[in-house]
């Protein structure tokens, strides 16, 4: 049984950094309405799941968790359970039927209505608010963040790219950029609060545009870098079509902009990219990588790869392996394709690659990328890197964990340092995912 009062709430956040940023906004909205954040779900009268619909396994995780919440509601009938984010936006008709535990639904553009939805749910209704609002950027809301070292700052919401496999345009709507002055106001608050790292967020972050101020993403990134000279500045996620010489030169010219770019490619086959509606060829992607590496010596690159997309032949898969071998990304998010209802692929393409083949191809991709990552990380042994300490290591309270400007995870001996410190670390060992060292 939960022990919190009826106006206490707890948010479980699933999925991407944008969801984490949204949860900070939701917390602020609810606190302004008189609700109190609980430290754990067993101390909350309201439990909210901020969900992700990008992949099938993410949806499965939510459905499994709802079984747990149904058990809690049987013991405490006053408990309110809300499903927020991308899943209800995408699957409204199915959501209430999924579990009797669900009391309310809210989509990414309607979090301002949560106080009213909660009160309606208490009266026995099953309310939902899932309208798209192309004007909603949650301007004027001060997010309530967890921690005081790294902060996510959404600069745009939604996506116009309509990749065939992707549900984001159907869950987060059309692109809309936050006003330049609002972004800079948020950054200035973070600087005044002493944050050490600021990450600019968007589903398609480098298509940012504030036409009233004449500010594109390169100009925004430059302005943020100048406004926060003592902080590291990052951004994610980029689309290859929006990588420009202006943007890369901005990164090169500003020492506090991290020397790391996450640039999803999804497949090494131009034919597969065409079916995916990615809007570029492999040759064009390679040109972008060449531009980046020519202007940013030592840059670390990461990517996304999907195995087994509709119509993928063995030669397409081999092209993906060849691409990984050629470009040698530092790391990659690797998945096999799962159909998302409502997408172009679900409506018009045939999911014709057998699951056993998808899994085999994915494993080959993972094995190759792990080998490449391991080789790259081994090359770092003996070097000294600057690490922003983020937290205690999961291994030991005598160690801290942090990241390099290139986004490599480093575990190092504590030696009196604290989270938030910038530490020069001599790398003494490496795996394919983590560097280990000692302060110097």
From Swiss-Prot:
Catalyzed chemical reaction(s): N(6)-dimethylallyladenosine(37) in tRNA + (sulfur carrier)-SH + AH2 + 2 S-adenosyl-L-methionine = 2-methylsulfanyl-N(6)-dimethylallyladenosine(37) in tRNA + (sulfur carrier)-H + 5'-deoxyadenosine + L-methionine + A + S-adenosyl-L-homocysteine + 2 H(+)
Domain TRAM: 378-440
Cofactor entry: [4Fe-4S] cluster
Residues annotated for [4Fe-4S] cluster 1 binding in this entry: 16, 52, 86
Domain Radical SAM core: 145-375
GO cellular component labels: cytosol
UniProt xrefs under SMART domains: Elp3
Keyword Metal-binding: yes
InterPro entries to which the protein is assigned, alphabetical: Elp3/MiaA/NifB-like_rSAM (IPR006638), Methylthiotransferase (IPR005839), Methylthiotransferase_CS (IPR020612), Methylthiotransferase_N (IPR013848), Methylthiotransferase_N_sf (IPR038135), MiaB_methiolase (IPR006463), rSAM (IPR007197), rSAM_horseshoe (IPR023404)
Subcellular location as annotated: Cytoplasm
Family statement: Belongs to the methylthiotransferase family. MiaB subfamily.
Function: Catalyzes the methylthiolation of N6-(dimethylallyl)adenosine (i(6)A), leading to the formation of 2-methylthio-N6-(dimethylallyl)adenosine (ms(2)i(6)A) at position 37 in tRNAs that read codons beginning with uridine.
Listed name of the protein: tRNA-2-methylthio-N(6)-dimethylallyladenosine synthase
Species of provenance: Pelodictyon phaeoclathratiforme (strain DSM 5477 / BU-1)
